């Protein structure tokens, strides 16, 4: 790490060329593949007994041949004729992308560490915007029900690869590395294979996930940072304390240009953008911007974000990707839940002297529901049930042992219960458990060539225990005769902090 710091020192002679030399350092590829650096066998050497797929010697030779223009500049139609690319094109692409992703992440990690510490006796700006997915849960529980309107935003996707390069250019002051990145993106990769916009999120090549996730996250960070800048300093559109934006190239030039446009048309209403109750939450490619303000205020934010993104990223942003919804009238799909705010009317009888009257108190209640139709669709796609939710057997698992079949069905059921434990109504989850349990029984009955009724009579209790969730197991063991109040605690909303994403239902082939 000392050598990494030496390359990243601002006053170093290699100030503008500090990342490119790291490409040829052997420990970079050990870090990229989580290999230990204290191995007796150095990855410097290429031999048949070691996986030399990420040897830096191969990468060095590859980069050298990349810059031999007479041998490398080819068209797509000639790729089959060129022995350098051929069938190894994806292999070379993965080698460079893994190493480059590991290298380019170094300045970001060091920047984060330095921002959280003191430098020369002065406190460096500490970002209060670093939040994990865990902060989403208290936001939904505590703040969501007190807001009025929400902007459902699909983050604009980069329409050109050069936008990704320009995004990194704000942070990486290294021309050689950026040229290598640009060359790699245009020669090795196809835009359609890198990023697809068929869904709200993005899908990446499985072989280069780390590299492409880094590019996407840096792009999303750029979108979010500009929004935070506008959110914190929207009244005068100028910041002197937001340290993360001070190093950007031409950033304030674009800001001043945008201010001139808005100053002419919105001299009176510009102060309305200052909203202390504005909240921003993102999950994958979908984000929400919730406020306690009015509909005109949210409409101004929509118009403002569209114009700013188009100006800052030099791309067309369709206004249909931002929808303004009232929380009390719409449900939204976020983090796999259907979230909504409902009004519960509570009637209270009040009496004053001899007169009595009823008072209607509307109370906002936040609800998170399990999307039953998409979930049954996923189960049907994995051949656990029909599209109508009727359980069916899974013939591809019939060759496994009984314990393996029960374990696989039980694991899927427990994973679903674990992920959707934050649901305010668990009735849907018990329906999913019924589908999986009966599908498991049909699969076992098919294997033993018997009926489901006969099989359930023979091993019904054992099959039931495998589908108990961890909470149900604890309650059944600790309180064998648990009262309904204890089981009611379990049926309430529970957020698990180890939830990041839901795994594929059929992760066994």
From Swiss-Prot:
The keyword Plastid applies. One of its GO terms (biological process) is RNA splicing. One of its GO terms (cellular component) is chloroplast. It is found in: Plastid, Chloroplast. The keyword Chloroplast applies. One of its GO terms (molecular function) is RNA binding. Keywords: Chloroplast, mRNA processing, Plastid, RNA-binding, tRNA processing. Its main location: plastid. Disulfide bonds: none annotated. Belongs to the intron maturase 2 family. MatK subfamily. This is Maturase K.
């Amino acid at each position: 790490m000392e050598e990494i710091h030496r390359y990243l020192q601002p006053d170093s002679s290699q100030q503008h060329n500090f990342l490119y030399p790291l490409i040829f350092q052997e420990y970079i590829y050990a870090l990229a593949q989580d290999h230990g650096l204290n191995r007796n066998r150095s990855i410097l050497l290429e031999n048949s007994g070691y996986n030399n797929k990420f040897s830096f010697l191969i990468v060095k030779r590859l980069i050298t041949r990349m810059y031999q223009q007479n041998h490398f500049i080819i068209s797509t139609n000639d790729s089959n004729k060129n022995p350098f690319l051929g069938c190894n094109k994806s292999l070379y692409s993965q080698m460079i992308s893994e190493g480059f992703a590991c290298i380019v992440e170094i300045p970001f990690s060091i920047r984060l560490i330095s921002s959280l510490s003191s430098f020369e006796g002065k406190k460096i700006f500490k970002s209060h915007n670093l939040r994990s997915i865990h902060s989403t849960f208290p936001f939904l529980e505590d703040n969501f029900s007190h807001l009025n309107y929400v902007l459902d935003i699909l983050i604009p996707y980069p329409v050109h690869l050069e936008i990704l390069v320009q995004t990194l250019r704000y942070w990486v002051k290294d021309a050689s590395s950026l040229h290598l990145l640009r060359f790699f993106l245009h020669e090795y990769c196809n835009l359609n294979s890198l990023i697809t916009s068929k869904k709200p999120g993005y899908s990446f090549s499985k072989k280069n996930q780390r590299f492409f996730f880094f590019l996407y996250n840096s792009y999303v960070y750029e979108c979010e940072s500009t929004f935070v800048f506008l959110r914190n300093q929207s009244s005068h559109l100028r910041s002197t304390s937001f340290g993360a934006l001070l190093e950007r190239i031409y950033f304030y030039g674009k800001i001043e240009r945008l201010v001139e446009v808005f100053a002419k048309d919105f001299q009176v209403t510009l102060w309305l953008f200052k909203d202390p109750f504005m909240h921003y939450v993102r999950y994958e490619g979908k984000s929400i911007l919730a406020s306690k303000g009015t509909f005109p205020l949210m409409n101004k934010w929509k118009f403002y974000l569209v114009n700013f993104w188009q100006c800052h990223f030099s791309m067309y942003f369709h206004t249909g990707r931002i929808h303004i919804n009232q929380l009390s009238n719409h449900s939204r799909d976020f983090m796999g839940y259907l979230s909504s705010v409902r009004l519960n009317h509570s009637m209270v009888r009040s009496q004053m002297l001899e007169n009595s009257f009823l008072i209607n108190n509307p109370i906002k209640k936040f609800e998170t529901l399990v999307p039953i139709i998409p979930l049954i669709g996923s189960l049907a796609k994995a051949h656990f049930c029909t599209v109508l939710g009727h359980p069916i057997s899974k013939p591809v698992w019939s060759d496994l042992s009984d314990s393996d079949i029960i374990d696989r069905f039980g694991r899927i059921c427990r994973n679903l219960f674990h992920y959707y434990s934050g649901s305010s109504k668990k009735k849907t989850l018990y329906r999913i458990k019924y589908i999986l349990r009966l599908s498991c029984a049909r699969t076992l009955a098919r294997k033993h060539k018997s009926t489901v009724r006969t099989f359930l009579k023979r091993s019904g209790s054992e099959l039931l225990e495998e589908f108990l969730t961890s909470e149900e197991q604890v309650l059944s063991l600790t309180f064998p005769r648990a009262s309904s109040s204890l089981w009611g605690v379990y049926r309430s909303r529970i957020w698990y902090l180890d939830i990041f994403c839901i795994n594929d239902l059929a992760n066994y082939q």
